[in-house]
């Protein structure tokens, strides 16, 4: 039950929800369309910027609603490829990171779905501090909005592959998809949105029923349960065959080809035997494998595969008629891999606090 003093998160309201909410406070329904456009098209950060509303209405909105925005904390631009890494501060002081990647086909942003992550994948910097909390729908939206504001360029593609497991924040993530792709908002095509999961089977199946046209990317990283469990604790909860069945179900329901993400770790999952086993596992599936040279993490004793091993792995998959690419590295000179910048910032902050 909402307390008397708690304000409503206006940015997390759909247009229909906003209409209903405004009616409760005695405002006309047509105002909802105006306000929604200010929030989700013009991307304003303050009610005072809504200049076609009366001063009285703006004051009323400020008293009834909370306008949640993320704030630019640090920003780094790659000298290699123009990739921009953003560190955003949330209203409670937590920080999240996002990446803007510029391609010839448009601008793509990688956003976070949680502050930290509880999945514990051994090769990922995001999990080192555990999970702090879920991001609100409004915060996920404003990650995209803030990047578009700061860059001055339209965002056309979104990958939800930053910090966090989206399926562990399912309701907020699903509402984010509906709102970011709404024709009343930024209207980003669902076909240009990709969500990554480590394999939470019930939520994957639920996502297949949502009627979305987004791409599902599975963080696979090993060709069998035994090896997968060594680097991904989630494998102890969901058997690989059940995860793959959920991927097949997603393809059946949506017609969208599933992408399998495979981070190559030297001496762990990059052998020819692993490549052959992976080929057998995915044989006959309409899918794509994305090979990722793992980013070294000083807290883990994992190293990226050699260039020869990466190419050999790819060749074996291709010989077995598996669609495969090696992910292009972007922003490697600015710690653009998931979790690296946030961790560097929090480590630095902790050192400063200790030295006070």
Swiss-Prot record:
UniProt organism field: Lachnoclostridium phytofermentans (strain ATCC 700394 / DSM 18823 / ISDg) (Clostridium phytofermentans)
Alphabetized InterPro entries for the sequence: Aldolase_TIM, Methyltransferase_A, RlmN_N, RNA_MTrfase_RlmN, rRNA_lsu_MTrfase_RlmN/Cfr, rSAM
Active site positions: 97 (proton acceptor), 338 (s-methylcysteine intermediate)
Residues that, per the record, bind [4Fe-4S] cluster: 117, 121, 124
EC number: 2.1.1.192
Protein name: Probable dual-specificity RNA methyltransferase RlmN
Subcellular location per the Swiss-Prot or TrEMBL entry: Cytoplasm
Molecular function via GO: 4 iron, 4 sulfur cluster binding; metal ion binding; rRNA (adenine(2503)-C2-)-methyltransferase activity; rRNA binding; tRNA (adenine(37)-C2)-methyltransferase activity; tRNA binding
Disulphide-bonded residues: 110-338
């Amino acid at each position: 039950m909402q307390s008397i003093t708690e304000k409503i998160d206006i940015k997390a309201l759909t247009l229909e929800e906003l209409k209903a909410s405004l009616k409760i406070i005695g405002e006309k329904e047509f105002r909802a369309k105006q306000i929604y456009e200010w929030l989700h098209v013009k991307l304003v950060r303050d009610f005072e910027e809504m200049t076609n509303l009366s001063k009285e209405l703006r004051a009323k909105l400020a008293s009834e609603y909370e306008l949640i925005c993320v704030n630019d904390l640090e920003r780094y631009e790659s000298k290699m490829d123009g990739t921009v890494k953003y560190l955003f501060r949330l209203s409670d002081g937590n920080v999240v990171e996002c990446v803007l990647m510029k391609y010839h086909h448009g601008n793509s942003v990688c956003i976070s779905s949680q502050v930290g992550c509880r999945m514990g994948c051994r090769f990922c910097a995001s999990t080192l501090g555990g999970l702090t909390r879920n991001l609100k729908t409004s915060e996920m939206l404003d990650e995209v909005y803030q990047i578009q504001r700061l860059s001055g360029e339209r965002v056309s593609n979104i990958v939800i592959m930053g910090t966090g497991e989206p399926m562990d924040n399912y309701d907020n993530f699903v509402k984010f998809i509906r709102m970011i792709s709404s024709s009343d908002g930024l209207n980003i095509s669902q076909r240009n949105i990709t969500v990554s999961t480590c394999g939470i089977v019930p939520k994957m199946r639920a996502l297949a029923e949502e009627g979305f046209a987004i791409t599902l990317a599975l963080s696979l990283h090993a060709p069998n349960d035994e090896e997968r469990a060594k680097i991904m604790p989630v494998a102890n909860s969901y058997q690989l065959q059940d995860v793959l069945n959920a991927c097949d179900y997603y393809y059946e329901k949506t017609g969208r080809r599933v992408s399998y993400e495979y981070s190559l770790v030297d001496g762990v999952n990059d052998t020819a035997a692993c490549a052959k086993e992976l080929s057998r596992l995915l044989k006959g599936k309409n899918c794509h494998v994305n090979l990722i040279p793992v980013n070294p993490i000083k807290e883990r004793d994992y190293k990226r595969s050699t260039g020869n091993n990466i190419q050999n792995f790819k060749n074996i998959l291709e010989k077995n008629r598996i669609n495969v690419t090696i992910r292009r590295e972007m922003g490697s000179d600015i710690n653009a891999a998931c979790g690296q910048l946030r961790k560097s910032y929090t480590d630095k902050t902790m050192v400063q606090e200790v030295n006070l």
